[in-house]
């Protein structure tokens, strides 16, 4: 029970959330009636300025070049006429049907950047596709792809989608068209949930090979090896737990969970149509690849692995299949500019290292590769095309890294660089390096952050006021807020949407009840969203606009978890999480030690709570601890969730049981449902 409780508590750390809009703080939600400035809370069409900005994209790019669409649709074997996956209660978990409106337009509507429209159409091409004879992909059944390689007697599966229900549907489509064969191995390319969450839809947990055996013994055992890059388990759970609630809330902005698909709503994300909301599973690997160049033969298929740590994920690897002259690029080349920084929040990625691993792949395999395929979007065929694809992708990441450093050394700040930097024209016009997911602007900020951190060296910015305090002082100095709003409305009518958003959001932070400021800010953000080429940027703008118009939202976890990822947390990770959720103020005057003995995993640790801080001493016990506990590792979940009934049954306590109770009672789990989540677009 404790594991189920903490699985629910941590669910938003890994998954997206669904929501129901509501007004907050008793504020009356604006309706269709007009304010003094003539504003309403309704969704608006594109303005003339936005329509012209989007129309100009047709002059910037070669829309007669249909190679990416041809690659996205090439090799189609089968696709259902409509695709909408539901759970047993009828809840929609994944839908391509929601994007059927794409067929109603000959060209992009005024409210959509035409380049993003092209990417959305390409990502709407779903079904079972042949990559080459013996390699097949199910695309469009989740944000990522499920790939199978035919061995002598069965399938080798590369990545398993986000949700069990989606991977089950994908495997059913494969079996319907290609026959039913056993799964001989599962290879997970990297440590993000949209690539491993559906594994229980591909194989049963009891069929996993014994990780204590050698890989040769695993393959001979008749069980299924689960093969990952080294560090997979640690990074799969760690990145999503420590800052999970913050990431979970921000993910709703990045992925547009509040938004309805449509020409004024959500479109593609650049690497797919969004994430599914089914059941997320997890299995620890039975075998880890620990060095580049390692070779395995599985069911007659030769595989050579290239580790690429610190690229798109902390633990990631490419795979070369020489018999097929096919190169699996994981998520290192995806047919779009990816993120050096993801908007939901995460550690920044190294653009130079990313480029270096791509060029290493070219050096190793580029001479022979006839097709590249990956975990998102579609393959690229032909040796010249493959090499150009990889070279150009590497060049974009390297350029952003190097040009940002050039500007840094010329004294420019992060905000200045993000406004200045542009790709060379030749790279900028390539469809598969366009900014559908990441952008040059925010990736440049990532490079700045990696090398310089948050501070721009201007002491005015060293210790600024709280945003709401600063906003109130601005309004105090400006005096007539109504006049400021009239000026902002005039600038809106001139198409100056970024400035209008900035000034009106300042008013919102000074006075969140100012309806004119909220609605004008929303209108400005909406137009910025319509102009955005990046799917996540569009989502960010439109989600903020919706929250300004209709208030914050109550959230409930829209996905289910098997709890396996939570069980994979090591004891040190659990102690780290305890330190995060512990009520530090309540324990600020306490100082005590606790020995923790975990016989089932052969570990012992000493914890010290000192002035509200939880310090962990690994592989150490105190001779005079205030309290000592002995329990299975999983019983730590009961302590974390203050499940005193389970603790009484599973935990042996010596010394001051009151201190254990005190610690448990001061574990502040972050709320998942009920009260509104933290604000983003307002104080």
Language-model regions, residue ranges each:
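Metallo-beta-lactamase
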Residues: 130, 154-155, 162-165, 221, 227, 231-308, ...
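Active-site metal-binding motif and surrounding structural segment of the metallo-beta-lactamase
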Residues: 153-154, 165-225, 508
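Conserved beta-strand hairpin/beta-sheet module of binuclear metal-dependent hydrolase folds
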Residues: 121-182, 317-321, 325-331
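Alpha-helical segment of the N-proximal tetratricopeptide repeat
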Residues: 472-503
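Divalent-metal (often Zn2+) His-rich catalytic cores of metallo-beta-lactamase-fold enzymes
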Residues: 38-50, 336, 355-416, 420-458, ...
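Feature captures hydrophobic
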Residues: 26-35, 490, 496-502, 506-509, ...
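C-terminal motif of bacterial Sec signal peptides marking the signal peptidase cleavage site
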Residues: 18-21
């Amino acid at each position: 029970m404790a594991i189920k409780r903490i699985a629910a508590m941590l669910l938003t750390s890994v998954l997206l959330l669904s929501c129901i809009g509501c007004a907050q703080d008793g504020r009356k939600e604006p309706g269709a009636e007009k304010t003094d400035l003539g504003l309403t809370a309704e969704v608006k069409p594109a303005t003339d300025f936005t329509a012209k900005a989007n129309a100009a994209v047709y002059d910037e790019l070669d829309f007669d070049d249909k190679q990416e669409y041809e690659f996205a649709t090439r090799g189609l074997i089968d696709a259902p006429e409509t695709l909408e996956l539901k759970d047993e209660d009828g809840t929609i978990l994944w839908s391509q049907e929601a994007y059927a409106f794409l067929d109603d337009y000959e060209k992009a509507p005024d409210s959509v950047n035409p380049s993003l429209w092209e990417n959305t159409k390409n990502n709407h091409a779903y079904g079972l596709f042949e990559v080459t004879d013996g390699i097949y992909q199910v695309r469009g059944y989740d944000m990522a792809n499920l790939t199978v390689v035919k061995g002598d007697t069965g399938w080798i599966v590369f990545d398993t989608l986000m949700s069990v229900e989606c991977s089950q549907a994908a495997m059913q489509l494969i079996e319907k068209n290609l026959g039913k064969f056993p799964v001989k191995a599962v290879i997970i390319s990297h440590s993000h949930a949209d690539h491993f969450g559906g594994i229980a839809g591909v194989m049963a947990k009891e069929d996993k090979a014994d990780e204590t055996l050698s890989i040769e013994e695993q393959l001979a055992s008749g069980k299924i090896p689960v093969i990952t890059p080294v560090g997979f388990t640690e990074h799969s759970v760690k990145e999503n737990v420590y800052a999970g609630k913050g990431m979970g809330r921000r993910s709703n902005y990045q992925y547009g969970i509040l938004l309805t698909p449509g020409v004024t709503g959500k479109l593609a994300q650049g690497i797919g149509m969004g994430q599914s909301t089914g059941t997320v599973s997890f299995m620890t690997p039975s075998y880890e690849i620990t060095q580049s160049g390692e070779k395995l033969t599985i069911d007659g298929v030769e595989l050579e692995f290239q580790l690429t740590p610190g690229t798109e994920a902390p633990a990631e690897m490419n795979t070369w299949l020489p018999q097929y002259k096919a190169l699996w690029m994981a998520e290192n080349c995806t047919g779009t500019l990816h993120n050096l920084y993801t908007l939901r929040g995460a550690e920044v990625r190294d653009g130079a290292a990313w480029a270096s691993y791509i060029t290493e792949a070219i050096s190793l395999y580029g001479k022979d590769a006839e097709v590249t395929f990956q975990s998102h979007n579609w393959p690229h065929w032909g040796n010249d095309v493959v090499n150009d694809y990889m070279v150009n992708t590497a060049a974009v990441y390297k350029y952003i890294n190097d040009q940002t450093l050039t500007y840094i050394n010329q004294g420019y700040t992060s905000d200045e660089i993000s406004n200045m930097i542009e790709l060379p024209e030749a790279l900028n016009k390539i469809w598969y390096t366009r900014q559908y997911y990441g952008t040059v602007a925010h990736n440049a900020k990532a490079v700045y952050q990696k090398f310089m951190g948050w501070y721009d060296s201007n002491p005015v910015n060293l210790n600024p006021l709280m945003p709401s305090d600063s906003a109130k002082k601005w309004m105090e100095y400006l005096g007539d807020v109504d006049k400021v709003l009239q000026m902002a409305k005039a600038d809106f009518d001139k198409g100056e949407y970024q400035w209008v958003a900035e000034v009106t959001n300042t008013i919102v932070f000074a006075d969140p009840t100012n309806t004119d400021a909220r609605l004008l800010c929303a209108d400005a953000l909406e137009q910025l969203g319509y102009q955005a080429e990046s799917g996540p940027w569009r989502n960010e703008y439109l989600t903020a606009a919706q929250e300004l118009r209709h208030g914050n939202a109550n959230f409930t976890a829209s996905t289910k978890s098997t709890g396996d990822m939570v069980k994979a947390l090591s004891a040190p990770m659990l102690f780290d999480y305890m330190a995060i959720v512990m009520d530090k103020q309540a324990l600020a005057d306490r100082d005590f030690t606790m020995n923790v003995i975990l016989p089932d995993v052969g570990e012992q640790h000493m914890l010290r709570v000192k002035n509200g801080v939880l310090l962990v001493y690994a592989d150490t016990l105190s001779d005079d601890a205030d309290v000592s506990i002995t329990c299975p590792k999983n019983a730590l979940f009961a302590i974390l969730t203050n499940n005193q009934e389970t603790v009484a049954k599973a935990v042996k306590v010596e010394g001051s049981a009151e201190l254990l109770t005190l610690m448990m009672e001061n574990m502040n789990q972050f709320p998942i449902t009920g009260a509104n989540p933290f604000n983003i677009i307002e104080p």
